[in-house]
Amino acid sequence: RFIGLFLLLLAVSILLYFFFTLRKTPTVTQTPIEIINTYTNSVDGFSIAYPKTFTLDSGYGYQGFGPQETIRGVSFVIPLAIATGTNLGNDSYISVEHIPKITTCTIGQFINLTQGAMPYTIIDGGISYLVASSTDAGAGNRYEETVYVREGLTHCYAIRYFIQYGAIENYPKGLVVEFDKPSLLSAFDTIRRSLVITQ
């Protein structure tokens, strides 16, 4: 009888020990470290930070107005891992573009306003931007562009978000998932906010 009582008390003690020990053990959340690179263009007078997983294209030129009106700049193409398994095109990117030697800078110099783009102004982090977006489609693909033109500068700079993706309804069911657009835009926003104009 006493042995049974002793064993019962021992079992209860062990359970209480593990219960309070586990409660006091902190849970450690592993936060991925984003390695950042900085691109500096001393000729065009700007620098910008971007994740190391993005691909830098310093020979980038925007040709939305035709090859004769190429806007020079630099682009940062999304990592393949973001697009894999989704309907997002792996050629989506964010770019910094600069039009030199002009006295008046307008958003219409960076995006075709005849396609329904309606400019508006935002203030983000104390910086004023003129913003306009456009969409296009072809062969089952969708193309979205949003341009941010920095206001109040003596030189003409813009940041472009270019997102290409396939219409999700055109894929066999279960083949891909719809890409996380808010997360992608958040990543682009972070890069945009890091732009520093040095001239």
Give the residues covered by each predicted segment:
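A structural detector for beta-sheet-dominated domains
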Residues: 49-51, 57, 77-79, 97-99, ...
